[in-house]
Design a protein with these regions (language model features):
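Gram-negative outer-membrane assembly/targeting C-terminal domains
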Residues: 140-167
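Active-site beta-strand/loop architecture of penicillin-binding DD-peptidases
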Residues: 1-50, 56, 62-146
Length: 167
C-alpha cells in the first residue's frame, strides 16, 4: 500500500476494520456507553452487519496478518500462547512519519481488535506494534509480563520529535 499524507480514518474506524477481518466478514457498529447494569442490551447494540465479501477472502487476509506477526513487520506483536494477527502502517507526511498498527487476537476466536496510531512516531513497528502488543496482552491476560511492564515504561519515557522533517 501507499501511505502519503494524512489519514482520514479514525482509530475507531481502523479497529472496526480489524474486527471485520477478525470476524471474517461482519462487524458490530461501535457504540459509546457509560455502563451496563445487568440488563439485556437492545439488539441495536449487538446486531451483526455483514459485508458482501466472501469469507474465503477474509481467511486469506487473516493468514497474511498472522504471517506478518510471525515473521514480518509485526514480529514485535508476537505473544506466547496468543495467536495475534496484525498489519503495520507508516504514513509519510511533511514531518516525521506516522506509526500505525491494526491487529486482533486470538486469530480463530477473536476477543479484541485494536488500532494504534502515533503521529510522528516513525515506522509502524516503532510505536504502533509494541503499544498494540501491550494492549492485547493486558486485555486478554489481565496483566503484563515483567518484560512487557519494562517495555511499557520505556515507551512511556520516549520522546517524539513532532514536526521534524526526516527526508
Amino acid at each position: 500500500s501507499i501511505g502519503q499524507g494524512e489519514v482520514t480514518l479514525t482509530p475507531l474506524q481502523i479497529a472496526n476494520l480489524g474486527a471485520t477481518i477478525a470476524n471474517r466478514g461482519y462487524f458490530i457498529t461501535p457504540h459509546v456507553v457509560k455502563e451496563v447494569e445487568g440488563e439485556a442490551l437492545d439488539t441495536l447494540y449487538s446486531k451483526r452487519r455483514y459485508t458482501m465479501v466472501d469469507r474465503s477472502h477474509y481467511d486469506e487476509v487473516v493468514q497474511g496478518m498472522r504471517a506478518a506477526v510471525l515473521g514480518g513487520t509485526c514480529r514485535g506483536a508476537n505473544l506466547p500462547d496468543i495467536e495475534v494477527c496484525g498489519k503495520t502502517g507508516t504514513a509519510q507526511n511533511r514531518g516525521k512519519d506516522h506509526s500505525a498498527f491494526m491487529g486482533f487476537a486470538p486469530m480463530n476466536d477473536p476477543k479484541i481488535a485494536i488500532a494504534v496510531y502515533v503521529e510522528n512516531g516513525g515506522f509502524g513497528a516503532v510505536y504502533g506494534v509494541p503499544i498494540g502488543r501491550l494492549m492485547i496482552e493486558k486485555y486478554l491476560k489481565g496483566q503484563l509480563s515483567p518484560e512487557d511492564e519494562a517495555m511499557a515504561t520505556e515507551i512511556q519515557n520516549r520522546r517524539i520529535d513532532y514536526g521534524i522533517h526526516e527526508r
